[in-house]
């Protein structure tokens, strides 16, 4: 059994707790600074208002002020999962930079691309750069990509994803933690390729869908 901490109590962060819980892991979800009321509501009803389903009984929901305590004081955390919106990566990097004292593997579920010095930057590289600015010398960050919808994952609909890390061994270790009979994980050492495809896939799907629609009468 592993101890997994998820930063972000939104749809995808909570949905990711389902395969983690099904594998028997201890899962703690820490809300962002904007999710305090959200956390109170979930703890009261045990229903996630966006996913519209009950959350696993063993998953613990806590507020942001308990982040450092959970990381450093309550046993060993084996994996930190970042599940915030793309604009929140800088915030998450700062919060983790303040809380982390030891190197812990990090998995980013967030999709998107950033700009740094007029160049595109994948989010794993952005987080590495920002955390080093915050004094974290060694980082071990993996990125997830794939057509995975939060509600589908929470309802255990089959889906396939890719975990990428320049150290393929780390990606494989994380995949073993969370792979289930409905959440299928492949691995890659191409972080830039996986993150870029994850960020722009919807552009291509919209273009393909629109071109197919041109063959049909307007309704």
Give the ranges of each region predicted by the language model:
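Generic structural signal for well-ordered, non-membrane alpha-helical segments
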Residues: 9, 13, 35, 89, ...
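Structural signal for hydrophobic packing residues in well-ordered secondary-structure cores
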Residues: 11, 20-21, 46, 50, ...
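NAD(P)+-binding Rossmann beta1-loop-alpha1 motif at the extreme N-terminus of oxidoreductases
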Residues: 1-54, 59-66, 116
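Rossmann-like NAD(P)(H) cofactor-binding subdomain of soluble oxidoreductases
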Residues: 61-62, 66, 74-157, 174
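Internal alpha-helical scaffold of NAD(P)-dependent oxidoreductase catalytic cores
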Residues: 99, 130-140, 158-219
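Conserved residues at beta->alpha junctions
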Residues: 33, 83-84, 165
């Amino acid at each position: 059994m592993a101890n997994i901490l998820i930063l972000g109590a939104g749809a995808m962060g909570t949905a990711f707790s389902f395969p983690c819980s099904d594998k028997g892991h201890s899962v703690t979800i820490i809300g962002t600074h904007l999710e305090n009321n959200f956390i109170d509501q979930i703890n009261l009803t045990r229903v996630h208002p966006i996913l519209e389903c009950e959350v696993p009984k063993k998953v613990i929901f806590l507020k942001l002020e308990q982040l450092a305590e959970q990381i450093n004081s309550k046993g060993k955390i084996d994996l930190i999962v970042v599940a915030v919106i793309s604009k929140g990566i800088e915030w998450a990097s700062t919060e983790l930079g303040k809380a982390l004292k030891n190197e812990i593997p990090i998995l980013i579920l967030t999709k998107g691309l950033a700009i740094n010095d007029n160049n595109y930057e994948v989010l794993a590289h952005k987080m590495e750069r920002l955390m080093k600015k915050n004094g974290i010398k060694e980082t071990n960050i993996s990125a997830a990509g794939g057509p995975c919808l939060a509600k589908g994952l929470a309802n255990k609909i089959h889906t396939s994803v890719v975990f990428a890390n320049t150290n393929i061994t780390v990606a494989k270790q994380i995949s073993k933690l969370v792979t289930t009979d409905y959440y299928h994980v492949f691995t890659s050492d191409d972080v830039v390729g996986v993150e870029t495809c994850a960020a722009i896939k919807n552009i291509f799907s919209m273009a393909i869908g629109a071109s197919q629609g041109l063959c049909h009468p307007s309704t």
